[in-house]
């Protein structure tokens, strides 16, 4: 996932639990494996004491995981809720959805779960005035079938994933739009 150095540090801070020292990702994986029906499985990178060091506060800032089980199914299903305070729809929507969907697949795989729903809650989704013509152009373009996503099924340790373990096939795209102005 693309995160600033400060945000990466927030995810890697290790805290003491009765089970030992863990960062947020370690804690999520531990809980998914040991207490999957807990209502406390989440990450949060919106750390107020660090905000003064950031040019841009975290937009997508927390992920809550919810595990369900369908009647008659031996495997559990991992669902997630992504909370986001703000989103530049043109510049970030596809990126946010894809990165957190891949994260869900990775976590589900290493915890031997099925992938369920990803619910994306955006408090302020916006299209800037200068983006309106670009968005109109994109809406008018031909639509293509969704590409296929593959995750190396042999990886069972979250920290062993590399970019080589993720493949996108049958990806068809129109002409690239370049130089999209980004607001900070």
Spans of features found by a protein language model:
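Single conserved hydrophobic/aromatic residue that forms the stacking wall/gate
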Residues: 1-13
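Structured secondary-structure scaffolds
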Residues: 20-23, 28-38
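Alpha-helix initiation and N-capping motif
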Residues: 22-25, 115, 132, 177
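Structural signal for terminal/edge beta-strands and the immediately following C-terminal loop/tail
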Residues: 170-184
């Amino acid at each position: 996932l693309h995160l600033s150095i400060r945000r990466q540090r927030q995810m890697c801070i290790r805290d003491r639990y009765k089970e030992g020292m863990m960062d947020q990702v370690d804690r999520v994986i531990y809980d998914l494996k040991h207490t999957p029906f807990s209502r406390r499985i989440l990450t949060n990178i919106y750390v107020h004491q660090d905000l003064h060091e950031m040019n841009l506060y975290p937009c997508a800032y927390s992920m809550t995981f919810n595990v369900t089980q369908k009647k008659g199914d031996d495997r559990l299903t991992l669902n997630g809720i992504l909370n986001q305070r703000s989103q530049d729809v043109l510049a970030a929507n596809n990126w946010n959805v894809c990165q957190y969907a891949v994260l869900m697949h990775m976590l589900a795989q290493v915890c031997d779960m099925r992938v369920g729903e990803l619910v994306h809650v955006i408090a302020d989704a916006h299209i800037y005035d200068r983006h309106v013509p670009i968005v109109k152009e994109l809406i008018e373009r031909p639509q293509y079938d969704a590409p296929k996503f593959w995750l190396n099924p042999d990886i069972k340790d979250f920290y062993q994933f590399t970019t080589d373990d993720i493949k996108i096939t049958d990806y068809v795209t129109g002409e690239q739009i370049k130089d999209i102005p980004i607001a900070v």
